[in-house]
Amino acid sequence: MKYREENKDLFTVPEYYYLAHCISTDFGMGKGIVVEFNKRFDLKRKLQTKYPDYINQYTHKRIGGDCLLEGRVLNLITKERYFHKPTIITMRLALKKMKQICLEHNIKKIAMPVIGCGLDRLNWNDVSEQIKDIFADTNVEILVCKR
């Protein structure tokens, strides 16, 4: 794995990067960077169309953390409702699912913001350690955009 953090706008990275960010199972996209993701990629409509009963499946199966690939966006599901807060456990489970998707789809480059640490209030040192630990045995390049 190649990991680096840069002071740059996430949405200026080349299009060969997949973009990762956090969402909730209800696909609520009203605050934070997810608003820009939705505006650029029409994610809420696409996810609701593709996964109309996702929240019930997630709750029934007690998944805890997940990741849904839509186009070039990796949607890390770290909480049930938009107003909930994720835990480092749900973040870890979502990151593990993202790794699985990367391996299945031969995804080699991911760019992401400082996930889970804005409105969600996780500690970035904890989250970045999870990312490094989970992706350590891969050849995926992870670029964290800190602007």
Question: Model regions: which residues?
Answer:
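Macrodomain-like recognition of ADP-ribose-binding/processing modules
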Residues: 1-147
